[in-house]
A protein has these predicted regions:
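Extracellular/periplasmic catalytic domains that process cell-envelope and extracellular macromolecules
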Residues: 48-50, 61-63, 83-84, 91, ...
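Boundary at the C-terminal end of the N-terminal hydrophobic targeting segment
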Residues: 4-8
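A short, N-terminal "cap"/entry segment at the start of jelly-roll beta-barrel domains
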Residues: 9-67, 154-172
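Short acidic-glycine-tyrosine-enriched beta hairpin
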Residues: 103-123
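Conserved short histidine dyad/triad with adjacent acidic residue
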Residues: 64-84, 122-124
Length: 172
């Protein structure tokens, strides 16, 4: 016996013998699937500093619909003030996630969140990150398409020359 979403009548999980219904946000995928750490493919993302990485876990961030991504930022790297049009839920997977709110980077506004913490960020909220105490990994859950706009266009890595392979897709 599984459960279903009343509005879709598509079973999400029915046990090991069933679960073959496909989902609208994962075309061609069965309803039950898993992603283990060794399945995660980290790539450079043009809107991030060159040493930061992004991995698509579920969905397609550049398209309308639910998606889950992971973001890995090495020690001392800052993501300068930016905003996303979509509401987001961040879950800290590892390291300490420092996030502050505002249009200007201000270290005194940073809040530290340990692994397991969940941070809800409403769409169009200006914020910034800093890997202040070492590398961190966050998981972001949202409804796409993913958008990212820097508050100062000079902080946007897409305005600089980058030669490393990157995650493809349109980011508005």
């Amino acid at each position: 016996m599984g459960f279903s979403m009343a509005s879709e009548k598509t079973e999400i999980f029915t046990g090991p013998q069933q679960g073959t219904e496909t989902r609208r946000h994962q075309p061609g995928q069965v309803a039950f699937r898993s992603v283990v750490p060794e399945d995660i493919e980290w790539k450079q993302f043009p809107a991030f500093p060159p040493s930061a990485r992004l991995a698509i876990v579920v969905g397609e961030p550049s398209a309308p619909g639910p998606y889950v991504i992971r973001v890995k930022v090495p020690a001392d790297v800052k993501l300068m003030p930016h905003r996303h049009p979509e509401d987001r839920a961040y879950t800290v997977i590892s390291g300490v996630f420092y996030i502050g709110l505002g249009d200007h980077f201000d270290a005194s506004k940073l809040h530290a969140y340990p692994p397991g913490a969940v941070i809800i960020l409403p769409g169009n909220t200006s914020h910034f990150h800093w890997a202040k105490s070492g590398e961190y990994v966050t998981q972001v859950t949202a409804i796409g398409p993913l958008g990212l706009e820097y508050m100062n266009s000079e902080d946007d890595p897409r305005n600089k020359s980058i030669t490393a392979p990157s995650v493809q897709g349109t980011v508005r």
